[in-house]
Every structure is written in structure tokens, then in C-alpha cells.
A protein has these predicted regions:
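Conserved catalytic core of the tyrosine transesterase superfamily
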Residues: 1-306
């Protein structure tokens, strides 16, 4: 339905503000654009200023009726709430009709993480004969798992140190990334990931010089790897691994956090490495850690099963 209507001017202005003042990542902006288009579609030509809480409740009911989960609707409401706060500050709008509107409840879902054996099997995969693409993909996936990066953070990495998009410091074994809300953070890079990145740098120098010369990860023709392209390469890699598990980029981040917490028990350190503004976002991994401990107990304790 989004293709049937153009992006309203108020949505375009808000997205431009997010990009300029919040330094929102491209993937974040695309998610906001999609959520704002939903609002425009549901409003059916009415301006945001003309909507009332009853309208928003009706929109939520429609979205839920279309099969969207409570979690997805919560994200959409967050985007709409932010829009209205911007309209109040910058356009003289008086009412935020989204305030106080809650999404339908959904069953709590834990993030899906690979086991340590699955992560090793996936990263040890040799999926195809094209050594250049395999070398690049291995470097990307090793870095995902080694440093717990978000997809947008990895896709945005540049070659030059000091880039506002992020870079890898090979000498120090660290990666600096441009995270959510423009926050920069620096995370260690493990030896296997550094070795894979070094091998990729040798291959990258021989690829086409056309296109984006700044990007760390590029296609065969020299263009920066897009988020969609990275997802597609990981799907191919996962199929070749024979794991029989649907693997997506964020699963590496979940696995990084879960395995680090299992080994260290240091929730605050994991929070810093993930770049979470709130410890509450990190606490979900304590549940994954408990699942791991329960599995160990069930498999190892002589009195675990009757």
C-alpha cells in the first residue's frame, strides 16, 4: 500500500531532521520512513495535527488485525510518538495523540542466539569457489561475531581511521563504529576476525577501483555492500553450513552477547560493548544465560531427569 502514496512533506521533514540532528543511520531512517508511511496510509489524507487519541487506538487495532505483533506495533508507536514530539517543538502542534497509547501485549520472545558450536561451524564454512567473495564474507561474519556489531554499523565501516562512519584499527585490534543516535563506541576485535580482515584487505586491493573507494566492505564492482546484500550473503553462507537454522546478522550480535555473558557474568561490560544506553536492554541476555545453564544441568547432572 505504501507505493500508492507519496511520502508526505511532514514525514520528509522529520526524516531530514533525524538524519541531521540525531545522525540516524540509513537503516534506522528506512524503518522510520516505513512507519511514517503507515501513519499516512491509515490517516487517509488527514494531517497528523488532525488526529486524536481515538484515531491512534483505531489504527493500532487495524495493525493488530493485520497480524502485526505487539512488539512491532510498539516500535511503530515509538516512531509516531517521536514525530509528534518533533511537531510540537517545531510546528506548533499542541497535542501528541500517541502519548499513553499502549500496544497489544505479546508473549515475551527471547532473542535467538547460536550455540558456541553452531557459531564455530558457521564461521568455519567454505561455501563456494569464489575466493574473493568468500574472503570478504568471512571477514564480515567474523567481525559480526567478534565484536557484536549491528548490521548498519558493519555496513557503514570505512577504510580511513577517524571516519564518522567507523573504522578498524588493525594495530590496536579495535573497531570504532557509528552506533544508534550518533553514539560512537570502540570494541575489541578478536584474532580470528583480525586475520580474516587482513586477508580481505589484500583481496580488496585487487577488486575494481570504481565505486565507493571509502567503504571497507565492497561488492565485486567496488560498491559499498548494502544491508540487503549482507543479509543475502549470510543466507547463502548459512545454507552452505548445513546448520538447518535461519541465520540473520543480528543473531551474531545476540550470540556475541550471550556467549560473553556466559563466560564472564559481567552484565555491565556486555552493555558497554553492545552500546546499549540502558542496562534494561542488556538484561534480556541473562535469560539466555539461564537457558544455557539449564541445558548444562539437564545434560550433566545425574539427578536432572527421572
Amino acid at each position: 500500500m505504501e507505493a500508492d502514496i507519496a511520502l508526505p512533506s511532514w514525514a520528509g521533514d522529520y526524516l531530514a531532521w533525524l538524519a541531521t540532528h540525531r545522525r540516524a543511520a540509513a537503516l534506522t531512517l528506512e524503518n522510520y520512513r516505513r512507519d511514517l508511511m503507515r501513519l499516512a496510509e491509515l490517516a487517509d489524507g488527514r494531517a497528523p495535527q488532525a488526529l486524536e487519541p481515538a484515531d491512534i487506538r483505531r489504527f493500532v487495532a487495524r495493525l493488530h488485525g493485520q497480524g502485526l505483533s505487539g512488539r512491532s506495533i510498539a516500535r511503530i508507536l515509538s516512531a509516531w510518538r517521536g514525530l509528534y514530539r518533533w511537531l510540537i517543538r517545531n510546528r506548533g502542534t499542541r497535542l501528541n495523540p500517541v502519548e499513553g497509547i499502549r500496544p497489544p501485549k505479546s508473549p515475551a520472545m527471547l532473542p535467538k542466539a547460536l550455540s558456541q558450536d553452531q557459531a564455530k561451524a558457521l564461521l568455519d564454512t567454505k561455501p563456494e569457489a569464489d575466493s574473493a567473495l568468500e574472503c570478504r564474507d568471512r571477514a564480515m561474519f567474523e567481525l559480526f561475531y567478534s565484536s557484536g556489531l549491528r548490521l548498519a554499523e558493519l555496513a557503514g565501516l570505512d577504510l580511513d581511521s577517524g571516519s564518522r562512519n567507523g573504522w578498524v584499527d588493525f594495530a590496536e585490534g579495535m573497531v570504532t563504529v557509528h552506533g544508534k543516535r550518533g553514539r560512537m563506541r570502540t570494541v575489541p576485535v578478536g584474532e580470528p576476525a583480525l586475520a580474516a580482515l587482513s586477508a580481505w584487505m589484500d583481496v580488496r586491493a585487487r577488486l575494481s577501483a570504481a565505486g565507493d573507494g571509502r567503504a571497507l566492505f565492497i561488492t565485486r564492482t567496488g560498491q559499498r555492500m548494502s544491508a540487503g546484500a549482507i543479509r543475502g550473503r549470510l543466507r547463502r553462507w548459512a545454507v552452505a553450513s548445513g546448520l538447518g537454522v535461519h541465520v540473520h546478522p543480528h543473531m551474531f550480535r545476540h550470540s556475541f552477547a550471550s556467549h560473553l555473558l556466559q563466560a564472564s557474568g559481567d552484565l555491565r561490560a556486555v552493555q558497554e560493548l553492545l552500546g546499549h544506553a540502558s542496562i534494561r536492554s542488556t538484561q534480556v541476555y541473562t535469560h539466555l544465560d539461564f537457558q544455557h545453564l539449564a541445558q548444562v544441568y539437564d545434560s550433566a547432572h545425574p539427578r536432572a531427569r527421572k
